[in-house]
Amino acid sequence: MAQVSMRDMLNAGVHYGHQTRYWNPKMKPFIFGARNGVHVINLEKTLPLFNEALAELTRISSNNGKILFVGTKRAASEAVKAAAVDCQQFYVNHRWLGGMLTNWKTVRQSIKRLKDLETQTQDGTFDKITKKEALMRTRELETLELSLGGIKDMAGLPDAIFVIGADHEHIAIKEANNLGIPVFAIVDTNSTPDGVNYIIPGNDDATRAIQLYLDAAAAAVKEGRGSNVEAELEATAE
């Protein structure tokens, strides 16, 4: 069972919040105190919440659920992509485009265009058009890949989103709320937990903390996928 320990979180700096003057009072239940003008997150609250979230990610994944990892901060971007790829799920790590979930029909058309351009790079189309046109299409392809590359194979809305930084990704959370999609999110002391179904109080800036969240989430998803494969094999054997 995918789980994290108190020691893991301490070593990663999960307990370091933001400066006290930037706090959000709604995070008061999860704050232990302050040190040198910086809030300290109560890891005794975070630990059970995090492990509960991991168990639910495993359950969703075991039912073939799709998880969308969201983290567009510079500190999270590459790690978000790596974690999603590692557990064969989906990601948005560059910029959240308004309507990515709530206007899925339009997004689907952009994904189709992205895939069409990818095909053109392989089937010789670019050799038959002018250099200028080829350059324009290459730039369009790069732009679409940056925005939609992580969801181009998602084939429909996700069953949950896992967010690094509730404050930074508030638009994604609001869209998920509007559609009834469960939200798992790292919520720092300057953020609101509103709209987050599975709150994980913790530092959302430190690279080591971000890596811990993503490694644990990816492990939970892989565990769920593994149990699903085992169940299918048993059913086939019977």
From Swiss-Prot:
Q: Which family does it belong to?
A: Belongs to the universal ribosomal protein uS2 family.
Native source organism of the sequence: Actinobacillus pleuropneumoniae serotype 5b (strain L20)
Alphabetical UniProt keywords: Ribonucleoprotein, Ribosomal protein
- What Pfam families has UniProt attached to this entry? Ribosomal_S2 (PF00318)
User: Sorted alphabetically, which HAMAP family does this protein's record hold?
Assistant: Ribosomal_uS2_B (MF_00291_B)
This chain belongs to which protein, by name? Small ribosomal subunit protein uS2
Give the molecular function GO annotations.
Answer: structural constituent of ribosome
The reply to whether Transmembrane figures as a keyword in the UniProt entry is no
Q: A Gene Ontology biological process annotation?
A: translation
Q: Does the keyword Glycoprotein apply?
A: no
Q: Name one GO cellular component term.
A: cytosolic small ribosomal subunit
Highest taxon of source: Bacteria
